[in-house]
């Protein structure tokens, strides 16, 4: 049985649709269940539903053979997992944003984000010295209350930025969801995993 860790929310819904297009017989109530572990014996699969940042932890430690995670999470966490396939779902991008025309702190601008590793790497590569402030939610609030000069966050439509009077300043990276695998599981279950990859690859939406 292959165990697949999946994040709750939008990625989960799009991933389930992709699996169904690949002719995996997931029951109709699959997306409505409140269970965190769901067995699908007809397909010899088990699904673990988790927070996005936890998916890579489950895969890295081998409690899940495979996982579906956003490229943003993979960039931030840098875990010991293999990236098998770009699923081309949940498309968005990482960006730097801030108040239009706002003056930056000249010594070390403060940047609020839930992606401290990505932000640190990006600004270091840009030759900018910044102070990173880690937040877990409502990142857009930071410039509005004077906590930070800029933010680094995921942008999908840009609506949240606009509604809070912020503008996108720089684009860091494109983000889609990826199929990842535990290295040991890949060696032990390579045949089953490759069949899954082939079936998904055949139905992936093209960019």
UniProtKB/Swiss-Prot annotation:
InterPro entries: ATP_PRibTrfase_cat, ATP_PRibTrfase_CS, ATP_PRibTrfase_HisG, ATP_PRibTrfase_HisG_short
Transferase as UniProt keyword: yes
Reactions this protein catalyses: 1-(5-phospho-beta-D-ribosyl)-ATP + diphosphate = 5-phospho-alpha-D-ribose 1-diphosphate + ATP
UniProtKB keywords: Amino-acid biosynthesis, ATP-binding, Cytoplasm, Glycosyltransferase, Histidine biosynthesis, Nucleotide-binding, Transferase
GO molecular function: ATP binding; ATP phosphoribosyltransferase activity
This protein's pathway: Amino-acid biosynthesis; L-histidine biosynthesis; L-histidine from 5-phospho-alpha-D-ribose 1-diphosphate: step 1/9
PANTHER family reported in the protein's UniProt record: ATP PHOSPHORIBOSYLTRANSFERASE, ATP PHOSPHORIBOSYLTRANSFERASE ATP-PRTASE
UniProt record similarity statement: Belongs to the ATP phosphoribosyltransferase family. Short subfamily.
HAMAP family linked: HisG_Short (MF_01018)
Note on domains (UniProt): Lacks the C-terminal regulatory region which is replaced by HisZ.
Protein's recorded name: ATP phosphoribosyltransferase
Lineage: Bacteria, Bacillati, Bacillota, Bacilli, Bacillales
């Amino acid at each position: 049985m292959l165990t697949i860790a999946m994040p709750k929310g939008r990625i989960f819904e799009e991933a389930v649709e992709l699996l169904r297009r690949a002719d995996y017989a997931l029951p109709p109530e699959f997306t409505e269940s409140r269970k965190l572990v769901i067995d699908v014996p007809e397909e010899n699969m088990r699904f673990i539903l988790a927070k996005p940042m936890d998916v890579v932890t489950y895969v890295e430690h081998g409690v899940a053979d495979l996982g579906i995670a956003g490229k943003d999470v993979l960039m931030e966490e840098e875990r010991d997992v293999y990236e098998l396939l770009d699923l081309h779902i949940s498309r968005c991008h990482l960006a730097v944003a801030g108040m239009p025309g706002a003056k930056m702190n000249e010594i070390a601008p403060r940047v609020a984000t839930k992606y401290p590793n990505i932000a640190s790497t990006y600004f270091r590569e840009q030759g900018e010295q910044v102070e990173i402030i880690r937040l877990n939610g409502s990142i857009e609030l930071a410039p509005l209350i004077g906590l930070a000069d800029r933010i680094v966050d995921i942008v999908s439509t840009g609506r949240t930025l606009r509604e809070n009077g912020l503008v996108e300043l720089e684009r860091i990276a494109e983000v889609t969801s990826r199929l990842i695998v535990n290295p040991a599981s890949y060696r032990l279950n390579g045949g089953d995993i490759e069949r899954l990859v082939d079936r998904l690859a055949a139905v992936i939406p093209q960019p």
